[in-house]
């Protein structure tokens, strides 16, 4: 009988302990985590509304061009593009036309080649110089050496547009995506996404379509 009573007491004590332990652990966890900042998941690239990442890259004229060095401008049209991609080539004349029209209004084009020439030799710096001369580029054509700028922006394609607005000497993202809705033919374009966003900014209006899907070639990154 004495043994039986001891067994019952042991079972009751174990039951109480098992019920109270999670609660005590939860209380302890709350004490540990209370007041501690949560660590968000690592963000990849920029979103609309973010402050743009500054950069300084070599232009095809061998001069360094920095975003923060631009003067008397209202913003900038940063376009990640390249030599070899058929999508990028299809848009070259349209990019030239956009630069001609909007540079005078305060929004110059800045083209950046994000590709690793070891993976795509046609996108080497020397071939960038040749292409810029052949096409008569009126805008800087910069080389993202070391591939540090394109991931900071979150570019994934060529071409990939990031429209920046300048406020108090800082740049903020107002549009991300495609130039328009038809890479094959400029004559068949129905929606000029980039120009619509530019016109809205110039009229001090909100950009209604702030993001679209960039259509183009994947950026060629180093496999080493």
Stretch-by-stretch model annotation:
Residues 20-36:
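Short, low-complexity, disordered segments immediately C-terminal to signal peptides
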Residues 89-134, 145-152:
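Structural microenvironment flanking redox-active thiols in thiol-disulfide oxidoreductases
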Residues 68-89, 198:
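Short active-site neighborhood of thiol/selenol oxidoreductases, capturing the structured segment around
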Residues 1-5:
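Positively charged n-region of N-terminal signal peptides that target proteins for export
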Residues 129-170:
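Short, internal strand/loop/helix patches
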Residues 32-68:
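N-terminal "domain-start" segment that seeds a small globular fold
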Residues 163-224:
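Thiol-/selenol-based redox modules, centered on thioredoxin-like
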Residues 15-18:
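C-terminal motif of bacterial Sec signal peptides marking the signal peptidase cleavage site
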